[in-house]
A protein has these predicted regions:
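Positively charged n-region of N-terminal signal peptides that target proteins for export
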Residues: 1-4
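Short, non-transmembrane alpha-helical segments in secretory-pathway proteins
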Residues: 19-41
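Mature extracytoplasmic domains of secretory-pathway proteins
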Residues: 48-89
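N-terminal signal peptide c-region/cleavage motif recognized by signal peptidases
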Residues: 13-15
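A cross-taxa feature marking solvent-exposed loop/turn segments within ectodomains of secreted
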Residues: 37, 62, 116-118
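Short, exposed beta-strand/loop patches in secreted or surface proteins that constitute
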Residues: 41-47, 68-70, 97-102
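Sec-dependent N-terminal signal peptides
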Residues: 6-8
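C-terminal partner/receptor-binding element of secreted or periplasmic proteins
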Residues: 94-129
């Protein structure tokens, strides 16, 4: 009697526990937190070379406000990106520090101020698409 040896490749898969979060989603959440606006009005214009460009229209006067941001570790680096005032990257020690974290299906944005105080806001990932 001949024996047949069957070789079956084993494939191991690991479940994905963390959500895939884009720089655009983080930038929209950070903009809402920093400027005290509803995250639902934040619009992602584009992502180019790891930099997200986001804007919103201010309701009371219809003006357009825009920023660009990039992620450096858990920090959100940002600069204004308005046609008449393209600003500097907020990386001076006197600037507030904006950090992000992912908690399940939420993005948590924490802004740490130079006086030691901070504010924290949470946004549902699915509303930042």
């Amino acid at each position: 009697m001949k024996k047949l040896l069957l070789l079956v490749p084993l494939v191991f898969t690991a479940p994905v526990h963390a959500s895939e979060v884009t720089v655009g989603q983080v930038c929209k959440a950070a903009s809402a937190a920093m400027f005290g606006r509803d995250h639902k009005i934040m619009q992602l214009d584009k992502v180019e070379s790891g930099i997200a460009y986001v804007h919103y229209i201010r309701q009371n006067d219809g003006t357009r406000w825009a920023i660009k941001c990039k992620l450096v570790g858990d920090q959100v680096m940002w600069a204004s990106d308005n046609p008449d005032s393209i600003g500097r990257w907020r990386d001076d020690p006197a600037d507030s520090t904006v950090k992000y974290a992912i908690d399940g299906k939420k993005i948590i944005i924490t802004e740490l101020y130079s006086d030691g105080s901070s504010t924290t806001n949470s946004y549902p990932l699915k509303q930042l698409k």
